[in-house]
Amino acid sequence: MRASAFVYPWDVVGDPDAARRIADLGVQQVTLASAYHSTRALTPRHPDHRIVTARHAAVLYPPDAGRWQGRELRPYRQSWVPGDDPYGEAAAALADAGLEVHTWVVLAHNSRLGEEHPSIAVRNAYGDRYPWAPCVARPEVRAYLVDLAAEAAVRPGAKGTELESCGWYGLAHLHAHDKIGGAPLGGAGQYLMSLCFCDSCGAGYEGLGADAEELRRAVVRALRPVWAGETAAGGGDRAGEWAEVEKLLGADRAAVFAAWRDRVASSLRAEAVAAVRAAAETDFRVLLHADPAPHRSGANVGVDPADVLAQADGVVLPCTGGEAARSAVLPPFVPHRSERTVLAANFTVVTGMGGSPATLARDAAHAARLGADEIRLYHAGLASDQDLAAVRTALTELSTGRAG
């Protein structure tokens, strides 16, 4: 199976051994961040630092001044990695080590953008804004995201891209000193708290024949037993989550939300993919980080499998965990694949972040039986030496057919 490792530019810039170390894992490709959200990242082998703090979402290359001149929404530049173009410097080093470089572009996830432009943020049923989550129904947000996708994806030398958060973002977010766990929000509760009631979304609901204010009140009513501790609004698996949403809201109201959000997300994906392809040379591969439950949001956006595979060249799917986790996400895409479709199983290989590098060979083999033809490894820069040793062993087993 073809394998690619996720990498940040700061893992490579300033470390002359990094590119060769990654190539020696046995991967054929790296997925290198070109536009990324704020984070605090470990760099356990870098000669100059151990922690990198990316203070806000930024592009890791020099943005095109002409593209963004005079626009209110535009990408921020980074200042925490030395040099004007850390992406380009890292990409060159990785390519010199024999690795194929693809870009990693985070789109609808940008806390600084929402803080500085509060009108663009998702606004929940209570009127609270989520600055990390730009509302993808808003025309100015869509224009920004589509142009960012084209610019950040098609970097010099890149052979393809992976678009993360190309759709709705909502409540779920690794926020600063988070303290929202007082009421257990299951999947259905997360969905209700992620529904947007900004002006654009309100107009969208009205356009479907619904009363936006009545919908908002219905969401507030549905969540009352959650805050009272009477229900966790869970639902279990993906199908159970949606059944719980319909139970809490009523099927008709749930259908309005689904129709609006699915339409918005699908059209954004289509526009972003088209913009990337227009900016790229032929055979430039466009993948989307995705989840087969359309109601889900976040880094792995919820999609309809048939719809997304008609738009993009493939998907990257969350496959960390046991066999049940993989069985839930891979099979829904298999009937809709073509000969060129990529179904990439994404595995966390950092033990401290919930990964299991020791079982990677077995887990990847299971994913292959379910239809995956590539794997992704999160993350070559964050993993410990011990974790990387386990990855090397696993990739050797997979390449020689010894994985069970």
PLM ranges: what are they?
Residues 2-12, 65-84, 128-143, 254-264, ...:
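The substrate-binding groove and active-site-proximal loops of carbohydrate-active enzymes
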Residues 6, 102-154:
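Active-site-adjacent "subsite" loops/lids of carbohydrate-active enzymes
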Residues 10-24, 139-152, 294-310, 326-330, ...:
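Short, acidic/polar
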Residues 16-43, 151-160, 305-317, 369-374:
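Catalytic domains of carbohydrate-active enzymes, especially glycoside hydrolases
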Residues 31-56, 83-127, 160-170:
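Glycine-rich, aromatic-flanked loop segments that form ligand/cofactor-binding clefts
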Residues 171, 278-324:
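Substrate-binding cleft/loops of secretory-pathway carbohydrate-active enzymes
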Residues 312-313, 317-327, 346-404:
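Substrate-binding cleft of secreted/luminal carbohydrate-active enzymes
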